[in-house]
């Protein structure tokens, strides 16, 4: 009973904040509780059908699981509160294993299900592949976390998270404005659009912030277990901060190997770092003082209703990716209500209505207040940073 009260309270809070113009889950394919709550999926034209695509299995599985859970939580709340424009919402999530080809297969599966809107994909490479399909089909797409520039290349596509260039630029600005360091070493994944895109914009902005990049060392996804060379060069360069625009799995290895080398600079990452405290066998003390740019923290006061509801539903703390997805669902709801769409409309007509409405809404969400979107699909919201202290995230000023 407690979970239901918290869930409905959060739904009411989020519903009031919307303004238009003024358990862990199973791996693999998921037809979620958002559908089960209706007793039946519903015939086409009677319910809105939102699809999701992302990794549930594989190295990036934590991200996809978080997005699936955050989406389900929001949709269940919306359905309990009466749906969107009086219609219930069905949700179907497909596992892409962080693979572009499998993401296309997942997209085709969702098309066969008669998906009308896509909240996905979760990671950049699959998102770049899928956005070409949604653009050709004129199907509305909102990615919660696809941060590569090309992830929203069509006029039908938007994102909740910051783009890679925005993250790199904002990271350099934050480090410079808060005088965290002057000499920067970068360790990045040159095989990842996410990592290399952030690095590129960071390097471009660094001189404007009085920062000197003294080392820039690459690795690839095929060689991501031994970082001795990269760490030695960073240490020899005299860097007082190491910027890690990478995912948390590699970051956890880097922190351990840096400690083994008695190398203790300030470490700073981006949203892909979220999840490092959940790595199996990782000594959380090695992350003490780690900073990362992220618009969401489980310890932030304004997030507590969501965090409680998420813990009650899934038994774990939400990652930022869950918050991105949750905000994405409520953004779709706000745009759908602004556009007054109904599920009996064609997918193309729904897309045309939503892509106009997305530029006219403003929402207060978990990842930002007064969030709004440009016609290019980019979110407008203020960046935040957190620091890990005593095994927990703390918001920084």
Q: What do these predicted ranges mean?
A:
Residues 103, 160-183, 196-198, 224-228, ...:
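Hydrophobic alpha-helical segments within soluble ligand-binding/sensing domains
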Residues 157-218, 241:
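An alpha-beta-alpha
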Residues 1-49, 80, 397:
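Short, low-complexity disordered leader/linker segments with a strong preference
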Residues 42-44, 48-72, 94-100, 122-123, ...:
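Extracytoplasmic "Venus flytrap"
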Residues 313-322, 333-393:
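Segments of small-molecule ligand-sensing domains
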Residues 27, 62-69, 81-151, 219-222, ...:
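Beta-alpha junction/loop-to-helix N-cap segments that form part of ligand/metal-binding clefts
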Residues 200-293:
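Extracellular/periplasmic bilobed ligand-binding domains
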Residues 255-326, 387, 393-395:
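Extracellular/periplasmic periplasmic-binding protein-like sensory domains
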């Amino acid at each position: 009973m407690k979970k239901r009260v918290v869930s409905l309270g959060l739904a009411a809070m989020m519903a009031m904040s919307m303004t238009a113009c003024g358990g862990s889950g199973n791996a693999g394919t998921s037809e979620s509780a958002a559908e089960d709550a209706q007793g039946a999926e519903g015939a086409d034209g009677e319910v809105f059908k939102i699809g999701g695509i992302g990794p549930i299995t594989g190295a990036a599985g934590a991200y996809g699981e978080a997005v699936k859970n955050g989406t389900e939580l929001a949709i269940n709340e919306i359905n309990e509160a009466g749906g969107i424009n009086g219609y219930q919402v069905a949700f179907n999530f497909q596992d892409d294993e962080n693979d572009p080809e499998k993401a296309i297969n997942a997209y085709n599966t969702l098309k066969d299900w008669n998906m009308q809107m896509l909240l996905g994909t979760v990671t950049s490479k699959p998102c770049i592949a899928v956005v070409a399909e949604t653009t050709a089909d004129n199907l509305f797409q909102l990615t919660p976390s696809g941060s590569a520039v090309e992830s929203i290349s069509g006029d039908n596509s938007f994102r909740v998270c910051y783009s890679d260039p925005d993250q790199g630029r904002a990271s350099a600005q934050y480090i410079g404005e808060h005088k965290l360091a002057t000499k920067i070493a970068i360790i990045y994944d040159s095989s990842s659009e996410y990592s290399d895109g952030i690095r590129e914009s960071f390097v471009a902005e660094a001189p404007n912030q009085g920062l000197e990049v003294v080392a820039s060392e690459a690795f690839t996804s095929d060689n991501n277990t031994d970082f001795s060379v990269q760490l030695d060069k960073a240490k020899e360069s005299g860097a007082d901060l190491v910027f890690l625009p990478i995912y948390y799995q590699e970051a956890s290895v880097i922190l351990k190997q840096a400690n083994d080398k008695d190398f203790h600079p300030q470490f700073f990452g981006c949203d892909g770092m979220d999840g490092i405290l959940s790595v199996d066998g990782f000594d959380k003390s090695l992350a003490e003082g780690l900073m990362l740019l992220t618009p969401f923290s489980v310890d932030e006061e304004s997030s507590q209703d969501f965090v409680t509801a998420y813990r009650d539903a899934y038994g774990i703390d939400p990652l930022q990716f869950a918050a991105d997805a949750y905000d994405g669902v409520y953004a779709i709801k706000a745009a759908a209500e602004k556009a007054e769409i109904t599920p009996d409309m064609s997918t193309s007509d729904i897309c045309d209505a939503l892509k106009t409405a997305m530029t006219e809404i403003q929402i207060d969400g978990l990842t930002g207040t007064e969030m709004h979107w440009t016609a290019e699909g980019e979110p407008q919201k203020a960046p935040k940073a957190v620091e890990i202290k005593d095994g927990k995230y703390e918001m920084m000023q």
